[in-house]
């Protein structure tokens, strides 16, 4: 379903392919992608909601993302790792505040918007 009135003219890209024979055999191919292709936006929580943090360890989302990246970076693509992180934040974290019990047991879920058109893996060092 439509989400607006605008048309995406896209962006023109060029890819050069070098032949092993000589530099004169180089082939340049041209192709077009949507303007917003290959964007990934990750927010610690959904629009309008509080993003929780531990005073000693930092935000739930960033701490979880670091742990997930550390554990899965060699075998798993980034979008899958963000999904793992979102599940962990949503299910394993709850707020606690000994000064203000009204904000205890509150939850959070990260918001991931992907316009990726390919899987993104991190290469080994």
Task: Annotate each predicted stretch with a short phrase.
Residues 1-125:
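Cysteine endopeptidase catalytic domains of the caspase/legumain-like
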């Amino acid at each position: 379903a439509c989400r607006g009135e605008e048309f995406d003219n896209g962006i023109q890209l060029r890819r050069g392919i070098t032949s092993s024979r000589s530099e004169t055999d180089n082939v340049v191919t041209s192709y077009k992608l949507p303007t917003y292709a290959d964007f990934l936006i990750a927010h610690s929580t959904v629009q309008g909601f509080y993003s929780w943090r531990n005073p000693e360890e930092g935000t739930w989302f960033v701490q979880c993302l670091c742990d997930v990246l550390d554990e899965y970076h060699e075998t798993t693509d980034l979008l899958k790792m963000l999904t793992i992180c979102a599940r962990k934040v949503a299910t394993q974290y709850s707020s606690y505040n000994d000064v203000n019990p009204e904000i205890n047991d509150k939850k959070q879920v990260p918001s991931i918007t992907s316009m990726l058109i390919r899987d993104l893996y991190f290469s080994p060092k």
